[in-house]
Structure formats: structure tokens, C-alpha cells
């Protein structure tokens, strides 16, 4: 004798074909497998060789993106536990919650470790500042 199991009906979904706004939003799948909107910010790096501007996604470390663009920035640990990649924020904001080297007062004073810093707004950073930080 065969048993037939019935499944509940799938919920109904509706959608609209209204025109989307002219802005572009990239959707990415994060570590949690949930989709999220990805913002991109203008990051200006003031290096000893001059200024460079990059459009950095909010989920990419500034150092990593600079390297992808062929910009040579100092680094050592790539984990936020040393000062090799130290910079100074001139304006803007970022998330460097993965770092463990800087104390709260240094972060409040605008120090940044570019190897573990994500932009959260347009930002200007003076790079190559390790000597200033540790002196």
C-alpha cells in the first residue's frame, strides 16, 4: 500500500515591473549566504608619490583594493596586529573593527590600519605613517 504525502502550498509572491531608479546597486552574497547591497566609496590616498583616488567597495579592505589597482602601500601582518600599514584619516569614516594594534585613543585621533579598514563613507587617508604613529 502506497502512502501519499501532501505538501503545503508554496506561499504566493508578487512583484512589480516599475522602473528602477537610475542608481546602480551591486548585490553580493556574504559569508552568511544572505544577499546584501554593496556600496562603493571614493577613497583618496595621499602617498609620498602623490595622491590617488579609488572607488572601493564597502566589503574590501583598502590595502587589498589598492594592491589590486597596482598601488604599492606598506604592510606586514595583514591582520591588523602591527603598525606597518598605518595611515592617518584626514576626513571620512571607516570600519577597522578587525584590528587589534591601535588603542581607542589612537583610533579616536584618526589612526588607521589600511590592511583591515573598510570604507564606510568617502575618505581621505595619508599613508606611510608608521614612523609618525610609533614616535
Swiss-Prot record:
Binding-site list for [2Fe-2S] cluster: 77, 82, 85, 115
Presequence extent in this chain: 1-38
Principal location listed in the UniProt entry: plastid
Single GO cellular component term: chloroplast stroma
Annotated cofactor note: Binds 1 [2Fe-2S] cluster.
Pfam families: Fer2 (PF00111)
BP term (GO), one: electron transport chain
NCBIfam families listed in its UniProt record: fdx_plant
Name of this protein: Ferredoxin-5, chloroplastic
